[in-house]
């Protein structure tokens, strides 16, 4: 848990993001530049709000429900819950963090799986990759670089 909190603590602040996404089925490529603000939240009703992320109109909150977490011999895997303002769905995500500079998320929603990996290249440069699979077939990949401002 210490590495997870440390990763989000390093992520606090305002970031400029450049993301390139490739849709494999129709060979489309899109590139988007955006701004994001990340804040660390407070503890609420048995949960710890690890981060609140803002990308313009999109808001995503990352919470860790400590009472539902059974400690295993590996202290680097957590189940996190993502909430957003776009709909009322709560997505359960497996989070794997092995050091304060690298974090991986695995989210399943129906037949879709999203694997995301984020890491710090330097203190103000964070990189990420995302792989979207539907029925275990890769349908999209994404590469992102974020600079802290």
UniProtKB/Swiss-Prot annotation:
Record InterPro entries: Calycin, CpcS/CpeS
Q: What is its EC number?
A: 4.-.-.-
Q: What keywords sit in the KW lines?
A: Chloroplast, Lyase, Plastid
What the entry lists under Pfam families is as follows: CpeS (PF09367)
Cellular compartment(s): Plastid, Chloroplast
Mention one GO molecular function: lyase activity
Q: Name one GO cellular component term.
A: chloroplast
Q: Which residues are connected by disulfide bridges in this protein?
A: none
| Chief site of localization | plastid
* Physiological role: Might function to covalently attach a chromophore to Cys residue(s) of phycobiliproteins.
Family affiliation: Belongs to the CpcS/CpeS biliprotein lyase family.
Protein name, entry field: Chromophore lyase CpcS/CpeS homolog
Species annotation: Pyropia yezoensis (Susabi-nori)
Query: Gene name, please?
Result: cpcS
């Amino acid at each position: 848990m210490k590495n997870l909190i440390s990763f989000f603590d390093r992520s606090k602040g305002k970031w400029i993001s450049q993301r390139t996404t490739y849709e494999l089925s129709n060979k489309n490529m899109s590139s988007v530049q955006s701004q994001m603000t990340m804040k660390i939240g407070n503890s609420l009703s048995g949960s710890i709000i690890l981060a609140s992320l803002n990308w313009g109109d999109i808001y995503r909150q990352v919470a860790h429900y400590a009472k539902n977490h059974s400690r295993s011999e590996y202290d680097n895997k957590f189940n996190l819950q993502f909430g957003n303002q776009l709909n009322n769905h709560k997505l359960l995500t497996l989070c794997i963090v092995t050091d304060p500079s690298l974090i991986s998320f695995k989210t399943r929603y129906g037949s879709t799986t999203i694997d995301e990996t984020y890491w710090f290249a330097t203190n103000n440069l964070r990189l990420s990759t995302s792989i979207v699979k539907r029925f275990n077939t890769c349908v999209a990949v994404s590469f992102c670089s974020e600079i802290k401002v």
